[in-house]
Amino acid sequence: MPIAGTFDLYESGTHHGLMSSGFITPFLYMIGMTSGHSNKLWRSKLLDAMRALLLTPAIHKKFETANGEAAIAGLKALLNLHHNPHPWDDLWRAIAAEHPFRDAWWEDRNLLPLLDRIEIPVYIGCDWQNVPLHLPHTFKAYERLTNSKHLQVAMMGEHGLAWPWESLHIEALAWFDQWLKGRETGILDGPRFRYVIPEAEGWRTSDTWPVLEATHHAYALRVDGSLSEDEGEAGSRTYMNLGGGLNRPRPSETDPPAFLEWTTPSLQRDLDLIGPIELQLEAACPAPDTAFIMVLQDLDEQGRVTNVTAGYLRAGLRMVDEAASKPGAPVLSCQTFEAIPIGEKVTYRIPIVPNARRFRAGHAIRLHLTTDDQSKDSPALLEFRHASVGTSSLNTVLSSSRLLLPVLD
């Protein structure tokens, strides 16, 4: 029952060529620090007292809305603690510098090609909010577990997998009693893909993923900053990304923006979204490489923003595996670097992590696009931020770009 699993180190450590430095660095430091201690510490009276403290009702309740991955990304203090450099710094260096593209080193640490060997029943799942880590692995595993005797999926809403993960204990008990003790627990009743749509009520079911009732609608990235199925006047918009070491004390008021946003008009009715998402980006860049980081957002009537999902791409790794790709779900091999043709229009097919959400009437859908998300002002799901590509450029986005959203009609 690998809930919130990870199966491919490349997908965990980098996002289509962009190192997930906000997570992988403190994570490896934390593992290095904790692995250096024996059971003398972990079974000590001090740790027993801490466990007892966490089980007190008032403190325990606070963990109902905790997210372990976000906590790790925020623990900057870990970077100052001592840890054994072998193998943890070796692994960090391999991810950050030695293997920028998917190669044999990464493939040796990829379990996805082995999943079709699994024949036992498997129950997988995740919460929709775990966009930069566990969520994409869940769907990759679903595609590969083709020989499992019984494959079942649960896609949960916010805090559906609260740390320390108590929300699925009853479900797990029913699952294991069914298969290990032969008891009829009802866990197998109904369709095998079960999900919630955040902001909507109740559980839903499907016999397939993607959900067949959802169809892709193409939204143009209009020159006026709106997001609409009608492109309107053809044109473009430009934003600027600056690399490091420029010795500039502050931005200038004449600078182009560091990001672009496109927003739909207020929705006249609830809009349910579920499935794979793709940005078909047409852009020109004066540098040989850049990055595109996009965040899909829910904007309410008061202007409050909820980050829904995100997509990432190092432009030089844009090559699409057409045979493996589907409409709305491009597959990027990330094995071959191809420099951007300077100043020319290039079409990028960028996968955005599949997701689900009800955008309520009166709300708007917004797409935020930038190149560097290291700034605290830049939206980042779970605070997973990325190492910069390092180039400075003016990136021009054409209105012929399209955002493909899977809408339940």
Please give the residue ranges for each predicted region:
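Structural recognition of the beta-strand scaffold that forms the well-ordered cores
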Residues: 1-2, 123, 150-154
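Residues that line or immediately flank small-molecule/substrate-binding pockets and catalytic motifs
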Residues: 4, 156, 223
